[in-house]
Amino acid sequence: MPRKLISVLSVAVVMSAVAFGAHAADKLNYDAKSFAAAQAAGKPILVEIHATWCPTCKAQEPILSDLEKQDKFKNLTVFRVDFDSQKDAVKAFGARVQSMLITFKGSVETGRSVGDTNPSSIAALLDKTT
């Protein structure tokens, strides 16, 4: 009997985590068509110019992940541009280096930063999308 109760409670905990995770920002691999659609819909957008080998990008990941879970950023759409394989997109955004964060409110660019790993200033950048 206790074993069955533990199983039921475990399932309930997992289901709660899934339900609460739905409030996190949408994170997508960049493609021009989806980005244009998000802009046309007036969505708050973050573009990450990212490289898997970049230590600054790795330092930004947990900061962004925590911020994206906040209720005020639940409608944020995050597009990750691969610095090494998506050179056309990198060029289109005017990015010369990885670890660049660019924010938009619909089609209007609201800010950008390069190499920032300060949670407060990254939060301030994301605030410009709301």
Label for each model-derived stretch:
Residues 19-21:
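N-terminal signal peptide c-region/cleavage motif recognized by signal peptidases
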Residues 40-52:
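Short active-site neighborhood of thiol/selenol oxidoreductases, capturing the structured segment around
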Residues 102-130:
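Non-catalytic, surface beta->alpha helical segment in thiol-disulfide oxidoreductase systems
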